[in-house]
Amino acid sequence: MARIPKTLKFVVVIVAVLLPVLAYSATTARQEEVPQQTVAPQQQRHSFKGEECPAGSHRSEHTGACNPCTEGVDYTNASNNEPSCFPCTVCKSDQKHKSSCTMTRDTVCQCKEGTFRNENSPEMCRKCSRCPSGEVQVSNCTSWDDIQCVEEFGANATVETPAAEETMNTSPGTPAPAAEETMNTSPGTPAPAAEETMTTSPGTPAPAAEETMTTSPGTPAPAAEETMITSPGTPASSHYLSCTIVGIIVLIVLLIVFV
């Protein structure tokens, strides 16, 4: 039986030792590349954070460009980064069209004559009311408010506004209505309280203003977004270098043993 040369044994041992080292090093290198690939989309997603598209347009999710809205179909009325424009409002059957929808303004609708809509009925137009018996109308019905009525005093009552003074025609022999009271304050009589004015004197703490987050020198700034990028000299790269050095040492030992 032929004897296996020492050189062949030496080559087999070297291959058996270096293959696991190279395989492990390749796996470590692939793991180092993964964080770099995940950071790229995150940076692209925040690249338009400080920019906004003008009114009448929106931000495209695919290209990041500002796409214009369609006249009469959708709109945006302020700077934005919306993925799409807002659809124009369509006036209901109980409303009339006041102004059309543009790229920067929605449709304006209002209730038809004889109807109104206010805070109590924002979803629909209601029919204007009529003053009940014993009351007179002081304001007309509009598209945004119902009529206003007040009680009627006497047959010849004259009403100017809801808060107006009442004028009554008196016939001879009828006691005249009491005259308006005039509040004249004599010395020593406390005057009616005037409107309260908030005036701060020196030493009085002023009302708290809006809180402004300002960092002074030496104050840690808010944490920024983490970017996982490994540079040469990080633990992963050092590990790869250590594996290579170990393989070289093993190779030298084998040379000393078999040669």
Curated annotation (Swiss-Prot):
Annotated membrane topology: Lipid-anchor; GPI-anchor
Major location category of this protein: membrane
Record's comment on post-translational modification: N-glycosylated and O-glycosylated.
Swiss-Prot/TrEMBL TNFR-Cys repeat ranges: 29-66, 69-109, 110-149
Coiled coil: none
Biased composition (Polar residues): 30-45
Signal peptide residue numbers: 1-25
TAPE repeat spans: 162-176, 177-191, 192-206, 207-221, 222-236
Positions of the propeptide removed during maturation: 237-259
Glycosites: 77, 140, 156
SMART domains, per database record: TNFR
SUPFAM superfamilies, per database record: TNF receptor-like
Residue span of region Disordered: 30-56, 160-224
Function recorded in the entry: Receptor for the cytotoxic ligand TRAIL. Lacks a cytoplasmic death domain and hence is not capable of inducing apoptosis. May protect cells against TRAIL mediated apoptosis by competing with TRAIL-R1 and R2 for binding to the ligand.
Protein name: Tumor necrosis factor receptor superfamily member 10C
Source organism per UniProt: Homo sapiens (Human)
Encoding gene per record: TNFRSF10C
